[in-house]
Amino acid sequence: SNSKVPKMKVLITGGGGFIGARLARVLIDRGFLTGVAGDEEPIDEVLLFDSVDAPELFGKKEGGIAIRRTIGDISDRETVRGLIDRDDISVFHLASVVSGGGEKDFDLAMRVNLDGGRYLLEELRAHHGSQRMVFTSSIAVFGGAGMPSRVGDTVKQTPLTTYGVTKAILELLINDYTRKEFLDGRSARLPTVIIRPGKP
């Protein structure tokens, strides 16, 4: 194999949830990410980060990939700094206070959804390698009424909830960090997701 191809660390925030665990399974089974030029970048570490403990679904190592789990608070800057500990890293940012929770606790939604996301972006920016971020946004950025059946990048964002506002802001920040070439960022707007039982 080509020794110049960087081995990638994959960080999944919200890694204890349904989507995070499913994503981890797919990536571990596949064993590589696909780079910008279409080249395979082997994964050597997957870190599942979440605010709560989750069922143990993975071994400590599978197919040469080290699998680690960390519990912590994404709105703590030092915690985030510890997660972004190398240059060649791809972050799948799924961690979020959900819509109902954001309406009940504005400050929590701002801390987790906005500050946590911004800390990830800033820590990625501080590195100089192949830093990528895929952010799970939401159709909540469009609000509800009057949304067209087909939504392109030019449709105006009119969020009606704190959750939708935090998602829209982070999308804009990711676009700007990418424009400035601090990292390579993408946002994927998911439809309504069935959340895990219990907290959070």
Annotate each PLM feature:
Residues 59, 101-108, 144-148:
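Conserved catalytic-core motifs of eukaryotic protein kinase domains, centered on the activation segment
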Residues 144-147, 160-192:
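Active-site Tyr-X1-5-Lys
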Residues 118-162:
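Conserved Rossmann-fold NAD(P)-dependent oxidoreductase catalytic core, especially the SDR/UDP-sugar
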Residues 13, 49, 91-97, 133-139, ...:
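SDR active-site strand-loop-helix element
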Residues 89, 107, 111-118, 131, ...:
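Conserved internal alpha-helix in NAD(P)-dependent oxidoreductase domains
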Residues 32-55:
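Conserved glycine-rich Rossmann-like NAD(P)H-binding loop of the short-chain dehydrogenase/reductase
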Residues 9-33:
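N-terminal Rossmann NAD(P)H-binding glycine-rich loop of SDR-like oxidoreductase domains
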Residues 64, 71-112:
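NAD(P)H-binding glycine-rich loop region in Rossmannoid oxidoreductase-like domains
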